[in-house]
């Protein structure tokens, strides 16, 4: 049987909030089977829980937020959510003593290291996947995203930024997903932003944690970071990282083929909601026979060591 996963032990890290620029303490806690992914703000009294849920997602210029019925929000969840998807973590409590998850280096890699440091524990309960049964597509002008049936998890993402530094890079990336492929090829890709946008936001008291330490920063012509890019095509790889996190907002790994053109957080979420709203387009599946599990979701030995 393919089992649900949680952490072996509690781990903690500190970072900076993208919005406030203030120190944030992040605590990752194991959780029992069928808990799901729960984000928790401990800076509020009493603490407020935000279960990962496609319908709770709000996209802002800076990040993805989860918002509850009282309009309380937790921000910048997308990169940690991608790390959870990458390692197939089904049950976890994510605590922060702030309104946002720390931005770390702008990628998912620090969260992957933290999760691996905690260790991954298999629970004696079948892991549920969402399997795509019918093609579902959403569009917004010339942008689009779609899911098709496929016995695995594949991603094909194209961006189209009219910018010299981004034009010079490859703007399409394809991935046959696995935990190993995610860690090696996707997790280290950082978010990117324009210097003029960051300066404007900071002049208004926003994005106070934005810096060269947590993003690729570009001006009108080039990448400004002294160390340059981690990958030649880091821009499109990061958009794929975002999509992996966005699509895991249903709390389950998805079996299907994802293709997107110029998509972002909002359109990825719109696709996920469109799939879930169409009952005949998907189903929950479990795997009693390990041999029938798509290769995409075979646990790498290092994860369950």
UniProtKB/Swiss-Prot annotation:
GO terms for biological process: lipid A biosynthetic process. Its cofactor is Zn(2+). The keyword rRNA processing does not apply. Zn(2+) binds at residues 79, 238, 242. One of its GO terms (molecular function) is UDP-3-O-acyl-N-acetylglucosamine deacetylase activity. The active site is at residue 265. It holds the Pfam family LpxC. Pathway: Glycolipid biosynthesis; lipid IV(A) biosynthesis; lipid IV(A) from (3R)-3-hydroxytetradecanoyl-[acyl-carrier-protein] and UDP-N-acetyl-alpha-D-glucosamine: step 2/6. GO terms for cellular component: membrane. Its EC number is 3.5.1.108. It catalyses: a UDP-3-O-[(3R)-3-hydroxyacyl]-N-acetyl-alpha-D-glucosamine + H2O = a UDP-3-O-[(3R)-3-hydroxyacyl]-alpha-D-glucosamine + acetate. Keywords: Hydrolase, Lipid A biosynthesis, Lipid biosynthesis, Lipid metabolism, Metal-binding, Zinc. Catalyzes the hydrolysis of UDP-3-O-myristoyl-N-acetylglucosamine to form UDP-3-O-myristoylglucosamine and acetate, the committed step in lipid A biosynthesis. Belongs to the LpxC family. This is UDP-3-O-acyl-N-acetylglucosamine deacetylase. The lineage of its organism: Bacteria, Pseudomonadati, Pseudomonadota, Gammaproteobacteria, Enterobacterales.
């Amino acid at each position: 049987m393919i089992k649900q996963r949680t952490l072996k032990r509690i781990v903690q890290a500190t970072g900076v909030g993208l919005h406030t620029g203030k120190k944030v303490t992040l605590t990752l806690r194991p959780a029992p089977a069928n808990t799901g992914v729960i984000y928790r703000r401990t800076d509020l009294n009493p603490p407020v829980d935000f279960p990962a849920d496609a319908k709770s997602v709000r996209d802002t210029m800076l990040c993805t937020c989860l918002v509850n019925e009282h309009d309380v929000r937790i921000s910048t969840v997308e990169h940690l959510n991608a790390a959870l998807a990458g390692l197939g973590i089904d049950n976890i409590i994510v605590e922060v003593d702030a309104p946002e998850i720390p931005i770390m280096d702008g990628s998912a890699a620090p969260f992957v290291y933290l999760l691996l440091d905690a260790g991954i524990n298999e629970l004696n309960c079948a892991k549920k996947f969402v399997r795509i049964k019918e093609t579902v597509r959403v569009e917004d002008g010339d942008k689009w995203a779609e899911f098709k049936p496929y016995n695995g998890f594949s991603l094909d993402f194209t961006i189209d930024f009219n910018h010299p530094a981004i034009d010079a890079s490859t703007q399409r990336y394809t991935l046959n997903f696995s935990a190993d492929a995610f860690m090696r090829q996707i997790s280290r890709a950082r978010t990117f932003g324009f210097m003029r946008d960051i300066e404007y936001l900071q002049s208004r008291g926003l994005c106070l944690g934005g810096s060269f330490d947590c993003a690729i920063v570009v001006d009108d012509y080039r990448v400004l970071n002294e160390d340059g890019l981690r990958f030649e095509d880091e821009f499109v790889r990061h958009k794929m990282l975002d999509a992996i996190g966005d699509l895991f907002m249903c709390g389950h790994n998805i079996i299907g083929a994802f293709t997107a053109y110029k998509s972002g957080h909002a359109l990825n979420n719109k696709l996920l909601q469109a799939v879930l709203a169409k009952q005949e387009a998907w189903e929950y599946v479990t795997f009693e026979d390990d041999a029938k599990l798509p290769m995409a979701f075979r646990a790498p030995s290092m994860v369950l060591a």
